[in-house]
Swiss-Prot record:
A GO biological-process term: dichotomous subdivision of terminal units involved in ureteric bud branching
Major subcellular location class: nucleus
Name this polypeptide is given: Forkhead box protein D1
Pfam families per record: Forkhead
PANTHER family: FORKHEAD BOX PROTEIN, FORKHEAD BOX PROTEIN D4-LIKE 1
Functional summary from the UniProt entry: Transcription factor involved in regulation of gene expression in a variety of processes including formation of positional identity in the developing retina, regionalization of the optic chiasm, morphogenesis of the kidney, and neuralization of ectodermal cells. Involved in transcriptional activation of PGF and C3 genes.
Source species of the chain: Rattus norvegicus (Rat)
Keyword annotations: Developmental protein, DNA-binding, Nucleus, Transcription, Transcription regulation
Coiled-coil regions listed in the entry: none
Subcellular location: Nucleus
GO cellular component term of the entry, any: nucleus
Highest taxon above the source species: Eukaryota
Keyword Membrane: no
Lineage: Eukaryota, Metazoa, Chordata, Craniata, Vertebrata
GO molecular function: DNA binding; DNA binding, bending; DNA-binding transcription activator activity, RNA polymerase II-specific; RNA polymerase II cis-regulatory region sequence-specific DNA binding; sequence-specific DNA binding
Length: 101
């Protein structure tokens, strides 16, 4: 299997953008990636820490705590509204600029 040409930031962004509420948990992001890209299905779960690391490290991702009464594990992650133009012309292959909050 060939590794997809996308960065982890691009993969996370794709996952969040396709979700109805534009927010996902770490496990939902990983489910999207492994469901969409067979390469990551084979390598699971070695890359999950890389996803976690990128969520925490990059300002374009914002952590949203779970609402009280919403059971489940982990916080939600969404995109900072200011980072919408992070990818050139909607192409996930090339990031336009590093986003800083």
């Amino acid at each position: 299997l060939v590794k997809p040409p996308y960065s982890y930031i691009a993969l996370i962004t794709m996952a969040i953008l396709q979700s109805p509420k534009k927010r996902l948990t770490l496990s939902e992001i990983c489910e999207f990636i492994s469901g969409r890209f067979p390469y990551y299905r084979e390598k699971f779960p070695a890359w999950q820490n890389s996803i976690r690391h990128n969520l925490s490290l990059n300002d374009c991702f914002v952590k949203i705590p779970r609402e009280p009464g919403n059971p489940g594990k982990g916080n939600y992650w969404t995109l900072d509204p200011e980072s919408a133009d992070m990818f050139d012309n909607g192409s996930f292959l090339r990031r336009r600029k590093r986003f800083k909050r």
